[in-house]
């Protein structure tokens, strides 16, 4: 059975890690390189770095931040934010990223998913979806959660897979930063529409929330930020709880 992954997320603005609630009210959490290294040593399976204002500010990814962070890591490293072209993708890979997360650029040009997958492989392409409940469905948002697109999240995830995405990074905007639990209904809905791994994001607060999203949400991985940055949970302790609940995880020897 495939191991479930625990992923630490670094939301970066102006070269610093920040974290807020529902995508607003951001507060400083530290240096990306230092925090990434600490999370890796603490037992995180992967690190995701998201340059959360690159698209909104119309600029590229902070490559020097990516380079310094990659130098601290010995586990898979995903980078997102400001990646609009194959050249952007190549530059981020050259700085040490293992995978790319694309969101707004893929909505503007869905062929970008196919182009990056054809050049670098599907395993290197993560389709990031920021979703918010709108009535009986979930709507996809772009530009760091600032703009609704009208796209249905389930349909967009399925299209992303067809175009070559190797994973879905699914963030519940309703739950983001609240520490009240993942949106298991949303996660399960997306997981049922695709055959590629789904990473659940938004709402982690307790170990039980992780158990819930793996068991009820059928997530392949779960991502968190606040609870790791501010010392609420230790990754290895969390993994021991998951293992005791019958969820397969990679434990430190």
UniProtKB/Swiss-Prot annotation:
<comment type="subunit">
    <text>Heterodimer of HisH and HisF.</text>
</comment>
<dbReference type="Pfam" id="PF00977">
    <property type="entry name" value="His_biosynth"/>
</dbReference>
<comment type="pathway">
    <text>Amino-acid biosynthesis; L-histidine biosynthesis; L-histidine from 5-phospho-alpha-D-ribose 1-diphosphate: step 5/9.</text>
</comment>
<comment type="similarity">
    <text>Belongs to the HisA/HisF family.</text>
</comment>
<dbReference type="GO" id="GO:0000105">
    <property type="term" value="P:L-histidine biosynthetic process"/>
</dbReference>
<keyword id="KW-0028">Amino-acid biosynthesis</keyword>
<feature type="active site">
    <location>
        <position position="130"/>
    </location>
</feature>
<keyword id="KW-0456">Lyase</keyword>
<dbReference type="InterPro" id="IPR011060">
    <property type="entry name" value="RibuloseP-bd_barrel"/>
</dbReference>
<dbReference type="InterPro" id="IPR004651">
    <property type="entry name" value="HisF"/>
</dbReference>
<feature type="active site">
    <location>
        <position position="11"/>
    </location>
</feature>
<keyword id="KW-0963">Cytoplasm</keyword>
<dbReference type="InterPro" id="IPR006062">
    <property type="entry name" value="His_biosynth"/>
</dbReference>
<dbReference type="GO" id="GO:0005737">
    <property type="term" value="C:cytoplasm"/>
</dbReference>
<dbReference type="InterPro" id="IPR013785">
    <property type="entry name" value="Aldolase_TIM"/>
</dbReference>
<protein>
    <recommendedName>
        <fullName>Imidazole glycerol phosphate synthase subunit HisF</fullName>
        <ecNumber>4.3.2.10</ecNumber>
    </recommendedName>
</protein>
<dbReference type="GO" id="GO:0016829">
    <property type="term" value="F:lyase activity"/>
</dbReference>
<dbReference type="GO" id="GO:0000107">
    <property type="term" value="F:imidazoleglycerol-phosphate synthase activity"/>
</dbReference>
<comment type="function">
    <text>IGPS catalyzes the conversion of PRFAR and glutamine to IGP, AICAR and glutamate. The HisF subunit catalyzes the cyclization activity that produces IGP and AICAR from PRFAR using the ammonia provided by the HisH subunit.</text>
</comment>
<dbReference type="InterPro" id="IPR050064">
    <property type="entry name" value="IGPS_HisA/HisF"/>
</dbReference>
<keyword id="KW-0368">Histidine biosynthesis</keyword>
């Amino acid at each position: 059975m495939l191991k479930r992954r625990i992923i630490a997320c670094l939301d970066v603005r102006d070269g610093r890690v920040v974290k807020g609630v529902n995508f607003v009210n951001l507060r400083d959490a530290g240096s990306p390189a230092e925090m990434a290294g600490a999370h890796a040593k603490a037992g995180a399976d992967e690190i995701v770095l998201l340059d959360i204002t690159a698209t909104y500010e119309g600029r590229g990814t902070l490559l020097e931040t990516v380079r310094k962070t990659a130098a601290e890591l010995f586990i898979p490293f995903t980078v997102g934010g400001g990646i609009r072209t194959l050249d952007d993708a190549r530059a981020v890979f050259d700085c040490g990223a293992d995978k790319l997360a694309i969101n707004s650029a893929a909505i503007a040009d869905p062929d970008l998913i196919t182009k990056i997958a054809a050049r670098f492989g599907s395993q290197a392409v993560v389709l990031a979806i920021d979703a918010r409940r709108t009535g009986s469905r979930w709507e996809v948002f772009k530009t760091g959660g600032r703009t609704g697109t009208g796209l249905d999240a389930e349909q967009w995830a399925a299209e992303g897979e067809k175009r070559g995405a190797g994973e879905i990074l699914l963030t519940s905007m309703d739950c983001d930063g609240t520490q009240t639990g993942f949106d298991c209904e949303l996660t399960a809905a997306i997981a049922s529409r695709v055959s590629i791994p789904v990473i659940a994001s938004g709402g982690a607060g307790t170990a039980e929330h992780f158990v819930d999203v793996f068991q009820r949400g059928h997530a392949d991985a779960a991502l968190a930020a606040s609870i790791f940055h501010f010392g609420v949970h230790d990754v290895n302790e969390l993994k021991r709880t998951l293992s005791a609940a019958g969820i397969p995880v990679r434990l430190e020897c």
